[in-house]
Amino acid sequence: MSSTSQCGDLSNFIDHLYSPRMPARKELIQVDGREVAISNPEKIFFPQRGLTKLDLVRYYLAVAEGALRGAGGRPMALKRYVDGAEGEFFFQKRAPESRPPWVEAVELKFPSGRTASEVVLRDAAALAWIVNLGCIDLHPHPVRAGDLDHPDELRVDLDPGPGVPFDDVRKVALLAREVLGEHGLKGFPKTSGSRGIHINVRIEPRWTFPEVRAAALALAREIERRAPAIATSKWWKEERHGVFIDYNQNAKDRTVASAYSVRPTPDARVSTPLTWEEVPAVEPAEFTLSTVPARFAKLGDPHAPIDAESGSLQLLLDLSERQKTEGQKDAPWPPHYAKGDEEPVRAAPSRRKKK
């Protein structure tokens, strides 16, 4: 049996176990005129906080406008935690065949050559429907359903290494804002919901995935050049220190938890949009499933203007070309991608030395 068939069988089996049609208790909720069945609504999803699946659904409905701004209209893989945040999860790339007619799907082609029909959210009812499947956080691709080959978002993922103070993440985020601004782009920051910060940058959808990744790599290297003590663009963990700027999050088929995603942490932490004025003092632990709805109701969404701020990648791509003339060629890609012509040896330095 092929791995694709096995994955499909597993997904169908899980759908069967987790389907609202099972005799277990369910709750029917009305969302924008549509009926959504929530199976096992009292199932505990965050044991340390006593939060249930229904609490998770209600959270997403409370912040639906912001969550859909980040994830709506984009194909997305379903990261399903059928036993809650402390249980096992699996990525389901194929949209469930049993989905309602108002839940869209679009066919994607992956670097491996495989294809799959992935879910596209258009409204709050569809959002509630995928949360019922056990999706705690949302993982949309950086493209719109109408143009799957040209991303409209560059994603800056700041990932601190072990023991790195969060203040260094703040400093790198502010420097990233500076570099982006110098290259004609406006970044919108958010907590990652874990230990880092993400910066979303809307771009004109006219560059390919490799070009967007090249721009992200150029950005990462420039940040590292300006703050070498706390920032790194090095792919191999043994070469890293400080805050890693993960340029490969912009490679095709990579996804990042989107705005207002609840993360599978014990405290149900949320990847929360921020204003730049909040970044110097932000404390990620303050933003949880229990606290963010009130913040959203009071302050609105700091990312509300993002769709009006699409910029050009050309200046970052010009920077990339200058870096190449200085001897900085391509950097390693993730393991399952075909090796590029200019890519260095795809092996950690310590392994290369042994050969």
Place the predicted regions along the sequence by residue:
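C-terminal accessory nucleic-acid interaction domains of nucleic acid-metabolism proteins
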Residues: 18-50, 57, 68, 72-73, ...
